[in-house]
């Protein structure tokens, strides 16, 4: 940036920096020092930086947070050993052995396969609803 043609000026409460190009000849007469002082003294807005809260500490500490933590979690899930399906069913084998359909099959195979939706509740509901129509 050409310090003679442009200088930076502080404007507003939020400390935003504005570049102005007018009054070039007047500043040349004053000299470059005033313009350079303006540039050095101006407060720039706080731009968030990635790991600024860690200071100039080690790289290992930066890796404990943010993206690296998320990436480690994904890698651990991917590398986790897949358990066999038989191992996960072992606690249930006793209950599965006792499970039978004998009581349901006594009624008849057709009724056991397709239980009726009407168990008497529909009649009660229709009797309640018809007077309201």
From Swiss-Prot:
Biased composition (Basic residues): 51-66
Ranges for region RNA-binding (RRE): 13-27
Chain span(s) of sequence motif Nuclear export signal: 89-102
Assigned keywords, A-Z: Host cytoplasm, Host nucleus, mRNA transport, RNA-binding, Transport
Effect of residue 26 to A: Slight loss of RRE-binding
Region described as Disordered: spans on this chain: 22-66, 104-133
GO molecular function, one term: RNA binding
Documented effect of changing residue 19 to A: Partial loss of RRE-binding
Complexes and interactors: Homomultimer; when bound to the RRE. Multimeric assembly is essential for activity.
Known role: Escorts unspliced or incompletely spliced viral pre-mRNAs (late transcripts) out of the nucleus of infected cells. These pre-mRNAs carry a recognition sequence called Rev responsive element (RRE) located in the env gene, that is not present in fully spliced viral mRNAs (early transcripts). This function is essential since most viral proteins are translated from unspliced or partially spliced pre-mRNAs which cannot exit the nucleus by the pathway used by fully processed cellular mRNAs.
Name of protein: Protein Rev
Organism of provenance: Caprine arthritis encephalitis virus (strain Cork)
Species lineage: Viruses, Riboviria, Pararnavirae, Artverviricota, Revtraviricetes
């Amino acid at each position: 940036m050409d310090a003679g043609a442009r200088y930076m000026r502080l404007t507003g409460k939020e400390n935003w920096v504005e570049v102005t190009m007018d009054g070039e000849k007047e500043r040349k007469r004053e000299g470059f020092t005033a313009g350079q002082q303006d540039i050095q003294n101006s407060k720039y807005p706080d731009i968030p930086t990635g790991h600024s809260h860690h200071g100039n500490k080690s790289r290992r500490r930066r890796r404990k947070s943010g993206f690296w933590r998320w990436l480690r979690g994904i890698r651990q899930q991917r590398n986790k050993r897949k358990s066999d399906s038989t191992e996960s069913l072992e606690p249930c084998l006793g209950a599965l052995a006792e499970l039978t359909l004998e009581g349901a099959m006594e009624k008849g195979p057709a009724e056991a396969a397709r239980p009726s939706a009407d168990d008497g509740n529909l009649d009660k509901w229709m009797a309640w609803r018809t007077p309201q129509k």
